[in-house]
């Protein structure tokens, strides 16, 4: 069995020109199109197909054949669009300095808009046909029955659609609906003046967001971290009334749209699209808030290990031990298939196809897009972009994106195009589970206690950041929106008081609280851009924790059944709403025990961390 002790190398790979990187570390986009000439032919053919929408307009009521023709045309255009878009987009991400390729990307975006305009008649015309008529057509024409879920969901979402005049008025409001976020973005980027602080080692640094995060994560001098925290939050404290006015605009906008569409709350309006009951979010918040002891245990352990008299939020990310070994990419390729053994041999085989099929662009090169992602090219296969640098973070990023890619691979193999895409509510479940499986694999094989501690801290920090912090944020959003729903004023003081109260409710006496923590809400971009979004990070984490337990604990027959249910989830794509998809996999997010699976997971990890730390002494 392969040992997981990493090769000890001197440094991460240096930045190389793309031409100097071996082909086996670069994706092969010829799987989509052989060259730009073939791409252009596909682009031109797609343009012609879009024009075919016009011949179908006004004919849907003529019978099931016409509706089926429209659905098939939409699928055909969608599949071709994926290929035309991703070939240009992935090529551009290899070197974003290439203006010629960027122009081609923009060409495709123009074609997107053209397709949207050409098909804008479809939904109103379809919804003019009574649902029982469409259901009868699906009985008469088996090929049309393929689209049952998609068609019936369109009708479901019409429950809160207004008449023509009402929809027109709401469409006019869209012109200013983004104003609070746009103003927030301008205030927080272009207009924000980043302060400078002098570190204990002598140099003066400007506190950009990246520099601020780096100090909190690497600087072992608590006074430096405290100074960075105070100076960074002072920027938001200075403008807190402006941030409050902007956030009030978000809250008022959300409540206006919810009332106009006759929802009982902003939460109900936000969840309606994915057919998520409000009880899911309410259960998530209530269960998490009453199960915070493992989080507090972790804080207290960190305080003791770091030797601090007082423990603050700015002490929460500094490593407990120093450990700087490197994890070469080719070594990790040997470990990944072993890590997914609990998912069965078929899954392992398909994962090797992803790893060794020229689907991954591994290393950074000049001009390459930063970060990492998995691109779902329907009709071809997923592609993965990495900027692998031999660090532990890069290892888990690879495992994370591999989870997404395997989800895409299985969904695309078993679903027609119309159901191949999956919602964010489900999307992060496989990626988070992939990380958890890889963590277990690494921990079982680690021989260095420092490595074990680093791995455990990585896992625990993931739960704190992706679960507890996101639930706190969701709790905050819910309470802030209820201010306007109840007709109460929204002031900076009230918003800060809600946030400060939640910090104390979740972290208890394990933290020493700084007054400037009160304004942390002001700097969270999701609050302004995508309200009621972050809870999904936490529900995905809870789902993966529940699945991890079922896949790795219990009898062989129980684990085999869990594997089958999990693979069915991946193969199901977007063929149903998220809740029933997860329920069929054995996860019911309306039940407290599902959320408590994360709590139990964290509790176990903290216990293992305590043991590993004691092993150093």
Residue ranges and their predicted role:
Residues 403-417, 437:
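Catalytic Zn2+-binding segment of zinc metalloproteases
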Residues 379-399:
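Short pre-active-site segment immediately N-terminal to the catalytic Zn-binding motif
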Residues 422-450, 459-461, 465, 540:
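Post-HExxH zinc-binding segment in Zn-dependent metallohydrolases
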Residues 19-21, 30, 34, 122, ...:
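C-terminal, non-catalytic "cap/extension" segments appended to globular domains
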Residues 383-387, 414-424, 453-462, 481-483, ...:
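Short beta-alpha connecting loops at secondary-structure transitions
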Residues 1-322, 333, 501, 612-617:
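A well-structured
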Residues 356-373, 378-384, 504, 508-529:
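Flexible, glycine/threonine-enriched loop-and-boundary segments that flank and lead into catalytic domains
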Residues 311, 315, 319-378, 391:
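Auxiliary, metal-adjacent structural segments of Zn-dependent hydrolase domains
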């Amino acid at each position: 069995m392969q040992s997981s002790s990493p090769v000890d190398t001197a440094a991460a790979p240096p930045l190389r020109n793309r031409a100097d990187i071996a082909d086996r570390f670069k994706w092969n986009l010829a799987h989509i199109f052989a060259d730009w000439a073939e791409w252009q032919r596909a682009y031109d053919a797609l343009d012609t197909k879009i024009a075919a929408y016009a011949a179908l307009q006004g004919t849907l009521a003529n019978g099931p054949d016409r509706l089926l023709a429209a659905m098939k045309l939409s699928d055909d255009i969608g599949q071709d669009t994926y290929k035309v878009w991703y070939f240009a987009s992935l090529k551009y991400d290899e070197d974003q300095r290439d203006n010629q390729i960027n122009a081609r990307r923009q060409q495709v975006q123009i074609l997107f808009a053209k397709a949207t305009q050409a098909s804008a008649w479809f939904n109103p015309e379809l919804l003019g046909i009574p649902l029982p008529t469409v259901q009868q057509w699906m009985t008469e024409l088996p090929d049309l029955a393929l689209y049952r879920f998609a068609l019936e969901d369109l009708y479901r979402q019409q429950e809160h659609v207004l008449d023509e005049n009402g929809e027109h008025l709401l469409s006019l409001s869209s012109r200013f609906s983004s104003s609070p976020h746009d103003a927030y973005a301008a205030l927080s980027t272009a207009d924000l003046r980043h302060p400078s602080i002098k570190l204990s080692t002598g140099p003066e640094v400007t506190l950009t967001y990246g520099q601020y995060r780096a100090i909190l994560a690497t600087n072992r001098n608590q006074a430096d971290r405290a100074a960075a925290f105070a100076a960074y939050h002072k920027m938001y404290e200075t403008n807190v009334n402006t941030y409050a006015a902007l956030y009030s605009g978000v809250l008022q906008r959300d409540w206006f749209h919810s009332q106009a569409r006759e929802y009982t709350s902003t939460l109900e309006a936000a969840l309606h699209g994915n057919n998520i009951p409000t009880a899911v979010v309410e259960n998530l918040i209530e269960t998490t808030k009453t199960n915070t002891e493992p989080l507090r245990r972790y804080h207290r352990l960190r305080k003791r290990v770091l030797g601090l008299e007082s423990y603050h939020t700015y002490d929460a990310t500094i490593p407990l031990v120093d450990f700087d070994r490197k994890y070469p990419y080719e070594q990790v390729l040997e470990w990944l298939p072993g890590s997914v053994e609990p998912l069965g041999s078929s899954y392992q085989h398909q994962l090797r196809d992803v790893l060794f099929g020229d689907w991954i662009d591994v290393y950074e090169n000049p001009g390459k897009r930063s970060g990492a992602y998995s691109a779902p090219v329907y009709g071809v296969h997923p592609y993965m972009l990495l900027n692998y640098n031999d660090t532990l973070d890069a290892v888990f990023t690879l495992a994370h994106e591999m989870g997404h890619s395997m989800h895409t691979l299985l969904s695309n193999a078993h679903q027609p195009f119309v159901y191949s895409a999956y919602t964010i509510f489900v999307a992060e479940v496989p990626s988070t589970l992939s990380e958890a499986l890889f963590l277990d694999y690494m921990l079982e094989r680690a021989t260095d206690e420092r490595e074990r501690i680093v791995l455990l801290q990585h896992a625990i920090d993931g739960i704190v950041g992706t679960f507890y912090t996101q639930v706190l944020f969701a709790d905050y959003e819910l309470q802030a929106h209820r201010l306007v729903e109840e007709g109460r004023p929204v002031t900076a003081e009230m918003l800060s008081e809600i946030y400060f109260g939640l910090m104390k409710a979740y972290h208890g006496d394990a933290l020493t609280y700084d007054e400037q923590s009160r304004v942390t809400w002001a700097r969270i971009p999701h609050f302004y851009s995508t309200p009621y979004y972050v809870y999904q990070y936490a529900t995905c984490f809870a789902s993966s924790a529940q699945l991890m337990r079922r896949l790795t604990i219990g009898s062989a027959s129980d684990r085999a059944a869990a594997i089958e249910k999990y693979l069915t989830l991946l193969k199901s794509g977007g063929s149903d709403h998220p809740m029933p998809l997860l329920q069929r996999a054995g996860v019911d997010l309306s039940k407290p025990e599902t959320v408590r699976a994360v709590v139990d997971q964290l509790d176990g990890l903290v216990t293992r961390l305590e043991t590993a730390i004691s092993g150093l002494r």
